[in-house]
Amino acid sequence: DVLNIFESAIDLMSFQTLEKLHKRNWKKNNYLSLSGVTAIGNSIEESELPIALGKFLAINPQIKVLNLYLDNDKAGKNSIAKINYLLGKSYQIYDKGPKKMKDVNEVLTRKFKQKEEYSR
C-alpha cells in the first residue's frame, strides 16, 4: 500500500483535487498531513519521526511506499532527508513534491488561473 505525505492539510486537499480533476482514483491510497515539518529535529542524527507519521505506520503495517509531497523549500528538503534517514531501510520513499513551484497548493491554484485565462 501507498501513503502520500504532505506538509499541510491544504496541500493534501489540493492534491486530491488535482487527482479528481485528472479523473484518477484518488481514493485508492492513504493520505497524511504532517501539519508542518519544523519539529522533526535540528540534524539528521537527532531527528525524530513526526508523531502522526509514526502512529500511522505503526497501525498500518501494509504500507510499503511513502510518497513525499513536501514543500519545495529548505525546511521541506531537510525533512525529506530526515525521513529518508529514519525510514529509508524499511520503506520505498519517493520525493514527489513540485520542483518548480512552492507546494502542491500552488500547482492547483496555477492550474485554475491557466483555465481562467483560456476561457476569456
Please tell me what each predicted stretch does:
Residues E19-R120:
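TOPRIM fold recognition
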Residues L3-F6, I44:
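A short glycine-/small-residue-rich loop at the edge of a beta-strand within enzyme catalytic domains
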Residues D11:
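Conserved Rossmann-like nucleotide-cofactor binding loop
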Residues E7-S8, N72:
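Helix N-cap/beta->alpha junction signal
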Residues D1-N4, V65-L66:
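Short active-site oxyanion
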